[in-house]
């Protein structure tokens, strides 16, 4: 079985990712909050859920109200993908981007188990840690500029609260999917070309590494 390349050794495969994220003023961002979540599902189920946007209108009503879902799209590269998430004009819980043409949020996934969520005033990382065939730890960490400032502390609390809402909704779905995978009635379906190209990309990478001689 193949072993995924360490990130430093996969730098060439990351292509333009350093330049994309390097546009931000990361030097001012400091750790502001951390939270661990334990989920009763396989780690790959959790990654699948992160990468597909099909479920957003049905599972995440609060998030759906923030996003311009018609313009939501996923871009895949060699070892990573980006979900571009423009905001609605009336969005109130996610920070507005610096320019109207910018994405309100960008959700980066780096194969196999690291996520980077970039917003106008903060970013967060999700590290997905397999604990067993049906048990996963997800480590959330948030970074803000000047996290000791009183106003920023309020913003951190609001951000974590909104993230918790979404995470709880995702956990219900992931654990239900894991139960469904054990069912004798389970059968594979087709990928949604528009909403599940990120999932298809992940599965292709996983298949390649698992079958590498």
Q: In which residue ranges do the predicted regions lie?
A:
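C-terminal catalytic domain of Rieske-type non-heme iron oxygenases
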Residues: 1-213
